[in-house]
UniProtKB/Swiss-Prot annotation:
Substrates-to-products reaction catalysed: 4-hydroxy-4-methyl-2-oxoglutarate = 2 pyruvate; oxaloacetate + H(+) = pyruvate + CO2
Cofactor binding annotation: Divalent metal cation.
GO molecular function annotation: 4-hydroxy-4-methyl-2-oxoglutarate aldolase activity; metal ion binding; oxaloacetate decarboxylase activity; ribonuclease inhibitor activity
Top EC class for this record: lyase
Name under which the protein is recorded: Putative 4-hydroxy-4-methyl-2-oxoglutarate aldolase
Organism expressing this protein natively: Xanthomonas euvesicatoria pv. vesicatoria (strain 85-10)
Family: Belongs to the class II aldolase/RraA-like family.
Keyword Metal-binding found: yes
Matches recorded under InterPro entries: RraA (IPR010203), RraA/RraA-like (IPR005493), RraA/RraA-like_sf (IPR036704)
């Protein structure tokens, strides 16, 4: 089933829409799935760990606290995410290796690109509610993203009268 975030907003006017801060870096611009969240600052240890675990079509939401000094996602972690079935990654921070990210079948949204990697200090919190871009991102809630924007909903959104979901 095809969908767009404008169609979802028209059908579900109560969805929460993120401020338009993010750029697409991945090879897939439309993606959706239940969220797994990470809160970290200039340390992608948890992002790396999660990318190596089964994604099962989920979306990894990373609150990097808006830091533009270090990239929280690069080609190796993104390739792990693809291999393990993640639908996409939304990062309130930076990515790197953007030419390679663009070739991967993964949704990747971030604030910007930065060539500097993080230092891994084994820091970060997983499955905690985070808030950025004017949106509360809650583990298990659903994220929908495409070229028009990002929205979140507490459950999968049905597009037909029969209760089917995306």
């Amino acid at each position: 089933m095809t969908w767009t975030t404008p169609d979802l907003c028209d059908r579900y006017p109560d969805v929460t829409i993120a401020e338009p801060l993010f750029r697409h870096f991945g090879g897939r611009t439309a993606f959706a799935g239940p969220m797994v969240t990470v809160r970290c600052f200039e340390d992608n240890s948890r992002v790396r760990e999660l990318s190596a675990m089964p994604g099962d079509g989920r979306v990894l939401v990373v609150d990097g606290q808006g830091s533009l000094k270090h990239a929280l996602l690069g080609d190796q972690i993104a390739a792990n995410a693809v291999a393990n079935g993640w639908a996409g990654v939304l990062i309130h921070g930076c990515v790197r290796d953007v030419e390679i990210l663009a070739t991967l079948p993964l949704g990747v949204l971030a604030l910007a690109a930065c060539p500097r990697r993080t230092e891994r200090r084994d820091l970060g919190d997983v499955d905690v509610a985070v808030n950025f871009a004017g949106v509360p991102f809650v583990p298990g809630h659903w994220l929908y993203a495409d070229a028009n924007g990002v929205l979140v909903a507490p459950q999968p959104l049905a597009l037909d009268g029969a209760g089917g979901s995306i």
